[in-house]
């Protein structure tokens, strides 16, 4: 009789999530395990491929539900009356079925103008509850992958970062600063270029189904006073996935400032003491 070879577990592939591509193996994983694998690929700047399959995993949606449930806007309806109370395991199964066969249809967001503190108004887009959940699954994947690649000096709309960390960064690193760039991007969320954003995503994400899903969300349109409008540019302010898409887009500006402008305009490593402080 011949001897049997002992089978060794499949190792993670550099080209994909696993050499073993069976759906059953993937679906047994927890959302945290999946996101940790994606985060590791982001840290090593490996391409993100075959990621669409991760949207078949119910645990990804349960994680999104738990996160969104805590939000004050969980009971705010979009274009339908659907709210957090309408979510169930059966509803998640139907969402996954539509995602699996690329039959998922994004609903136009309900747009409402809300007052600004300094006067005027800004448009706020309110997706349906099911759209919020799917958007949050997409957000978690994009955030896990791109967060390790963002500049440490970027503080907007990022986990564990904000005004306080930005002020601390200024206090600790802005020594002898000689020049500043001041600017305001008006109507940023309304004017984000879809073509440029999708090209940026294609540089690292090698999964056309996942990219089509994101592009579909961008082009879902909006309804204002019961009139439908197409979305030719921008991403809805109020959309779950909008902040991470904005940061992916603006990361190019961060890199340009850090890698081009700062080295070009920094003449020496040490500034002379201001004579005022020598008196």
What are these regions (language model features)?
Residues 1-93:
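Non-catalytic, polymerase-adjacent accessory regions of viral genome-replication enzymes
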Residues 152-153, 158-161, 165-279:
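Conserved polymerase palm-domain catalytic core
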Residues 79, 140, 183-185:
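Residues immediately flanking
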Residues 29, 44-47, 125-139, 147-150, ...:
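Duplex nucleic acid-engaging cores and interfaces of nucleic-acid transaction enzymes
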